Amino acid sequence: MSTPYRDKWTSDCGTVTLYCGDCLEILPTLAPGSVDAVVTDPPYGLGDKWNGGAGGAKSSWRIPASEAKSWDMTTARGVEDLASFGECIVWGGNYYKLPPSRCWLVWDKKQPDNWTTGQCELAWTNLDRPVRAFRMAQCELANEGLKLHPTQKPVALMQWCLKWIESNSILDPYMGSGTTGVACVRLGRRFIGIELEPKYYAIAKRRIQDELNRVKFLEPKQRETQRTLLEVSQ
């Protein structure tokens, strides 16, 4: 029997599972109860400006056409159905026909008024809490290492998103370079990621493997520090 994915990888500790393939084909195959919440940043259709579309900054500013064409597409299919998985955060949710939300998440990029790109990005949620804002300049993404994907979010932003979600098992069906997965590993959450493009799937897999190894290396030192502090307090 054929599988709906090109590749599947599960971490040795069993907390991370990644799929390379179309999320619309893979999602129905996930085991019931395996996903508690969705945190994702799907592609949304600004259009190929170089091809006569109405595209804006994403397809024409700083990003070569050869790179942008792989992700600057029409609105991703299936986003409207993601809320059925429970708690849900969708970046770019203002581009989709989603239900009214009490709690929008705002990424304030701290950009001046004379910049041509947007000063904020919005995430739709189905959370029952007030609007929240995260302030971090987009240029600070460089502090986290190389920019690996055209629409890559800061790990700190995705960790902040997870702060508002109580669920333990997180799904990102539009995984990109794996930033949501890295954030989940850092916070001890389970993660399922799906990415259509093999190039970005490979990048995400490597990043998440590196983060798992980093956390595994730090755990013994953290336990030793906790043990020392406990002994001192006794």
Residue spans of the language-model regions?
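Class I S-adenosyl-L-methionine-dependent methyltransferase catalytic core
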Residues: 1-171, 179-234
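Conserved glycine-centered beta->alpha loop in an early N-terminal alpha/beta scaffold
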Residues: 174
